[in-house]
């Protein structure tokens, strides 16, 4: 029985941080204090960076990118936030909606890719 306790504890500890890794729209719009507001901006920057890196990886490996941002454009945190919040408004998003999903949809709305001629 004791051989299962350590793996169970490890699993519980490994899963716990993953549940807290998402930021929801309500907590983004209404941070508890200035530190949470700063954290939200850092989180949004990280999500944007991850999406851009994944998009570049997809393109490099012959896949269809999720959005087609101009190559010479560098988005600021404020611009990224505006894209995400417009996406939330467009979709009538509720407070429990994930900020990352809203940003992805907003990037697709703001920087659509041209469809291939065959479609």
Regions found by a protein language model. Name each.
Residues 1-4:
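Positively charged n-region of N-terminal signal peptides that target proteins for export
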Residues 15-21:
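Sec/Tat signal peptide C-region and signal peptidase I cleavage site
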Residues 82-118:
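Short, compact, well-ordered microdomains
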Residues 21-85, 106:
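Short N-proximal segments of mature Sec-exported proteins
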């Amino acid at each position: 029985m004791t051989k299962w306790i350590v793996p169970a504890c490890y699993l519980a500890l490994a899963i716990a941080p993953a549940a807290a890794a998402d930021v929801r729209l309500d907590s983004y719009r209404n941070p508890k204090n200035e530190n949470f507001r700063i954290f939200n901006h850092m989180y949004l920057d990280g999500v944007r960076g991850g999406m851009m890196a994944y998009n570049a990886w997809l393109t490099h490996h012959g896949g269809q990118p999720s959005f087609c941002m101009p190559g010479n454009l560098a988005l600021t945190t404020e611009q990224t936030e505006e894209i995400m919040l417009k996406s939330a408004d467009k979709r009538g998003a509720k407070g429990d909606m994930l900020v990352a999903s809203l940003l992805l949809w907003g990037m697709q709305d703001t920087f659509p890719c041209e469809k291939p001629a065959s479609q």
